[in-house]
Amino acid sequence: MTTVWKVLRTGREGVLSSAVVWPPLGLLYMVDGEWLRERWDGVFAFADAAQAREFADGLKPSCEIWKCEAESVHDVSHVLATYSLRWAVTGAHDKWLGLIRAGKLSSAREYARKAGFAQCYAPYGTVLCDGLRFIEEVST
């Protein structure tokens, strides 16, 4: 297992959601010790606590940083457009994600562009995890 850091926004009544809010990708999170697996294309997190802090500093005061345990961490930090919408192109999603997981990032970026995937941009230091489990809050 690998340690990663997840930045979450704090909403009304303590509801936690993804920090990169781009409808319809504003996912809600339950911090209950259970594994999150395969939400959309995986779960975004930060490989380094300092990078998570830098990103969170731009969101204050409405965020929390959580230390997490991660499964199958894929480094996508040098690819800006890293997220496709699952429903963008039927069947194309699996090919795109396969290219990311195989480390063929330039091919994945070109494939997404040609397939017309809707994209949002992941911050520097982002990793894509197949599974994520929240361990403890390290900062608010």
Where are these regions (language model features)?
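Conserved NAD+-utilizing ADP-ribose enzyme module
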Residues: 1-30, 35-41, 49-140
